[in-house]
UniProtKB/Swiss-Prot annotation:
GO molecular function: large ribosomal subunit rRNA binding
PANTHER family (UniProt xref): 39S RIBOSOMAL PROTEIN L10, MITOCHONDRIAL
Name by which UniProt lists this protein: Large ribosomal subunit protein uL10
Swiss-Prot/TrEMBL keywords: Ribonucleoprotein, Ribosomal protein, RNA-binding, rRNA-binding
Subunit structure, as described in the record: Part of the ribosomal stalk of the 50S ribosomal subunit. The N-terminus interacts with L11 and the large rRNA to form the base of the stalk. The C-terminus forms an elongated spine to which L12 dimers bind in a sequential fashion forming a multimeric L10(L12)X complex.
CDD domains per record: Ribosomal_L10
Source organism (scientific name): Mycoplasma capricolum subsp. capricolum (strain California kid / ATCC 27343 / NCTC 10154)
Pfam family, one: Ribosomal_L10
NCBIfam families per record: PRK00099.1-1 (NF000955)
Domain of life of the source: Bacteria
GO biological process, one term: translation
GO cellular component: ribonucleoprotein complex; ribosome
């Protein structure tokens, strides 16, 4: 990438990229990574890549411009320290879930806030989002609930068959 363009033009491009990423993402999580080692950040990036989640580090001042443009000004108080921005493109909870699970094993990563269903959520809110079941878990719960009546019928049939023998 050439640095021949003026700095304000490069910054405007980055702000436009951030706006685009936030608009297209199903969910966004913000985490502080101040004391996270390069190896651990690489591990987080690898896990994110496997789940089709984008991880980016942007200057907070550029993110501030983007969220102001989007009307998400409630996010501004969380834009301090060294932040990593996690964009989930497939569902609204996988970004929060990825960071929350990674943060449990790596205290240097702190989940701070996020955007869920177009609204800014604070630390407690994003942790609550992270605790929601994933799409796969919901499918499993649904399938299990569909099979429950069938299991009861089969158990009743087996009980009747055993009493006749």
């Amino acid at each position: 990438m050439s640095n021949s363009r003026p700095a304000h033009a490069r910054k405007a491009e980055i702000v436009a990229e951030i706006v685009s990423k936030i608009k297209s993402a199903q969910g966004v999580a913000i985490a502080e990574y101040k004391h996270l080692t390069v190896a651990k950040m690489t591990e987080l990036r690898v896990q994110a890549l496997k789940q089709n989640i984008d991880i980016k580090v942007y200057k907070d001042s550029l993110v501030r411009r983007a969220v102001e443009e989007l009307g998400l000004v409630d996010l501004i108080p969380f834009l301090t320290q060294q932040n990593v921005f996690i964009f989930s493109n497939e569902d609204s909870i996988s970004a929060a879930k990825l960071v929350a699970n990674f943060a449990k094993k790596n205290e240097a990563l702190k989940l701070k806030a996020g955007i869920y269903e177009g609204k800014v959520v604070d630390t407690a809110g994003i942790n609550e989002v992270a605790s929601l079941p994933s799409k796969e878990e919901l499918y499993s719960m649904f399938a299990s609930s569909l099979l429950y009546p069938l299991r009861k019928v089969m158990a009743a049939i087996n009980a009747v068959a055993e009493t006749r023998n």
